Amino acid sequence: MSLFGDTIAYLLSLTEDGEGKAELAEKLHCWFGGKEFDLDSALEWIKNKRCLTDIQKALIGASICFLKPKDQERKRRFITEPLSGMGTTATKKKGLILAERKMRRCVSFHEAFEIAEGHESSALLYCLMVMYLNRGNYSMQVKLGTLCALCEKQASHSHRAHSRAARSSVPGVRREMQMVSAMNTAKTMNGMGKGEDVQKLAEELQSNIGVLRSLGASQKNGEGIAKDVMEVLKQSSMGNSALVKKYL
């Protein structure tokens, strides 16, 4: 895969699946695909995207700025504050040393990536801020290599947190993780589905999940609750028993 293709993949790995991710992917392919775009407008779009966290906005915004190092746009607080606000004085010092000494000697994406892998996330965040403020001092390959290494670390942290919740010893947490996943799927289907059948199915899924949440489920007597829910759904013609059996 190309340099820009790798960067798009790492940036998208930060975000959760959904309609917002699909829209972001389309934008990234346009920006990194060689089409001319207005940097200021692109940064405003990223800044106002509600489905992104502050760190995600900062990383995506910085990557777009790296594409146009000669553009003299004003420094954006939504990029600098998350990058400089994490970690301790010691980790920030490590990030500064990394940027000023090691990364200045790098010449390739993979060299920068391998060096960045050996540093903690907070140091890499500060290193990226230094690169963002001094974009002309580093090659695009080095800046994107450092950014992608950080994206991999962030995506790994998110994956571990998600897996921990999915394997939680608390039944309520595991059940809600399944509910949230199902609800996100239903909302995406409803928002992006073009056929009436798809939208109808999405609405039924959301209705079913709403009923399950309203009635709740007992840790000790989940089977009885499941039977009660199926009976309610049958009487109200709101859905199928397969969904109930899966999520209770």
Swiss-Prot record:
It is found in: Virion membrane; Host nucleus. The keyword Cytoplasm does not apply. It comes from Influenza B virus (strain B/Singapore/222/1979). Residues 1-164 are annotated as: Membrane-binding. SMART domains: Flu_M1_C (SM00759). GO terms for molecular function: RNA binding; structural constituent of virion. Residues 165-248 are annotated as: RNP-binding. One of its GO terms (biological process) is viral budding from plasma membrane. Influenza B virus genome RNA segment 7 encodes the M1 and BM2 (AC P08383) proteins. Normal translation produces the M1 protein. The M1 termination codon overlaps the BM2 initiation codon in an overlapping stop-start pentanucleotide 5'-UAAUG-3'. Termination of M1 translation triggers reinitiation on the BM2 AUG in the +2 open reading frame. Keywords: Host nucleus, Membrane, RNA-binding, Viral matrix protein, Virion. The keyword Nucleotide-binding does not apply. Belongs to the influenza viruses Matrix protein M1 family. This is Matrix protein 1.
